[in-house]
């Protein structure tokens, strides 16, 4: 396998499937199947999930809610998603641990880097919830931060499009996809890969990012085997 340890970033919206809100059990089971394929081959897997299918702090702030309060609500939404994914993975026989940046000891371990790494070394899947534990930071930033901390080989950002394009492919049929692109070119072209904080953290730590279509069966396995899927962002 090309990658021994990965950090998989999933958006909360991805868990909605065809719904307008919440969690689609069918989509959850599909993702669990995809993850199981690489888990069974010995890939060490850490996961960060967003919470946008339940609540997004910045959206609450735009409607008059206190931003800090909204962000904490969003963190709790990621914990709900993490619990849902944990249940789906364990139903398929995979040992998992949910670690949260906020202490919620009845349902999750507190995030401790050394403990997370030990779990990964024992082939347990580790799901990181509650973002960074601080307001004003996105789950993309949390994903890169945790990826750097646990020494992941790569950040795999699963989305509903098959890579990075020069313009939005859902709005422009003439959009051109990049197979490989440098961090510098992403910034120069103003491409929307991750928020600036997350992206800069990844660049500074030379942690590559692969943006790919998580909804296409087999993509996750192909990437871990070294096939050219999605767009690779590298130094």
UniProtKB/Swiss-Prot annotation:
* Matches recorded under InterPro entries: AceGlu_kinase-like_sf, Asp/Glu/Uridylate_kinase, Uridylate_kinase, Uridylate_kinase_bac
What is one GO biological process annotated to this record?
A: UDP biosynthetic process
Q: So where does ATP get bound?
A: 9-12, 52, 56, 159, 165, 168
Entry's Gene3D superfamilies? Acetylglutamate kinase-like
Location, primary (coarse class) = cytoplasm
MF-aspect GO terms: ATP binding; UMP kinase activity
Which reaction is catalysed here?
A: UMP + ATP = UDP + ADP
Q: According to its UniProt record, in which pathway does this protein act? A: Pyrimidine metabolism; CTP biosynthesis via de novo pathway; UDP from UMP (UMPK route): step 1/1
How its function is modulated: the record gives:
Inhibited by UTP.
Highest taxon, organism lineage: Bacteria
What does the record note on quaternary structure?
A: Homohexamer.
Summarize the protein's role: Catalyzes the reversible phosphorylation of UMP to UDP.
Q: Which PANTHER family match?
A: URIDYLATE KINASE, URIDYLATE KINASE PUMPKIN, CHLOROPLASTIC
What this protein is called in its record is Uridylate kinase
Q: Which organism is it from?
A: Flavobacterium psychrophilum (strain ATCC 49511 / DSM 21280 / CIP 103535 / JIP02/86)
């Amino acid at each position: 396998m090309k990658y021994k340890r990965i950090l998989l970033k999933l958006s909360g919206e991805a868990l909605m499937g065809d719904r307008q809100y919440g969690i689609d059990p069918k989509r959850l089971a599909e993702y669990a199947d995809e993850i199981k394929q690489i888990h069974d081959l010995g890939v060490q897997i850490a996961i960060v999930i967003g919470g946008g299918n339940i609540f997004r702090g910045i959206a609450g702030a735009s409607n008059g809610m206190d931003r800090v309060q909204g962000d904490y609500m969003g963190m709790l939404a990621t914990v709900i998603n993490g619990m849902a994914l944990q249940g789906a993975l364990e139903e398929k026989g995979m040992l998992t641990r949910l670690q949260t940046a906020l202490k919620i000891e009845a349902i999750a371990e507190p995030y401790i880097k050394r403990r997370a790494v030990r779990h990964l070394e024992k082939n347990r899947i580790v799901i990181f919830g509650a973002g960074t534990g601080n307001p004003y930071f996105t789950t993309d930033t949390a994903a890169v931060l945790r990826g750097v901390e646990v020494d992941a080989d790569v950040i795999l950002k699963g989305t509903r499009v098959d890579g990075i394009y020069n313009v939005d492919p859902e709005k422009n049929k003439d959009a051109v996809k990049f197979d490989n692109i440098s961090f510098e070119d992403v910034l120069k072209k103003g491409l929307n890969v991750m928020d600036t904080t997350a992206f800069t953290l990844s660049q500074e730590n030379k942690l590559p990012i692969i943006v790919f279509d998580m909804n296409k069966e087999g993509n996750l396995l192909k990437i871990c085997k070294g096939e050219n899927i999605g767009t690779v962002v590298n130094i």
